[in-house]
Amino acid sequence: MAFRVGSGHDTHRLAEGRPLILGGVRIEHAKGLVGHSDADAVLHAITDALLGAAGLGDIGDLYPDTDPRWKDADSRLFLIETLERLNRLGWRTVNVDVTIFAQEPKLGPVKAAIKLKLAELLGIAADCVNVKAKTGEGVGHIGRGEAIGCHAIVLIEELTTEAQRHREDMRRDLT
């Protein structure tokens, strides 16, 4: 059985008039992240990490911000399509470790909700997901409250033929 590790990073600036979505969870805040899509830095970092682990490039290769199809797109779509791509290639997610860098808002109260949403989206147990939140301590664009960044590390494993068949059967049963 083969394992691979991937690392992803994303940063978006904050601006008024945008929703703040992190890890697929909408967070009440006066500002939201700016981007071509919904700018969910957590899902972008995880998607990038998964693509990297599988040797498939990065999120900009598959979902370029120059493509109007992705304007205001829900970042869950990027993650789900990436997971399906990995599954077709015989890989599954083992665990993910995420660090969110934000001066504001304070993320302690929403870390558990983000963790549960990520576990649901990734199709793994909640104890295989970790979410940490750090501030910028007043330093740089994150520390000044101008942006939010995220770093993600994922571990994927190659599925056995039997496990692949089981997942395909489960998917058919759901449709």
Residue ranges, per PLM feature:
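N-terminal charge/polar-biased segments
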Residues: M1-F3, E157-L159, T175
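Intrinsically disordered, low-complexity segments enriched in polar/charged small residues
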Residues: A49, E137, D169-R172
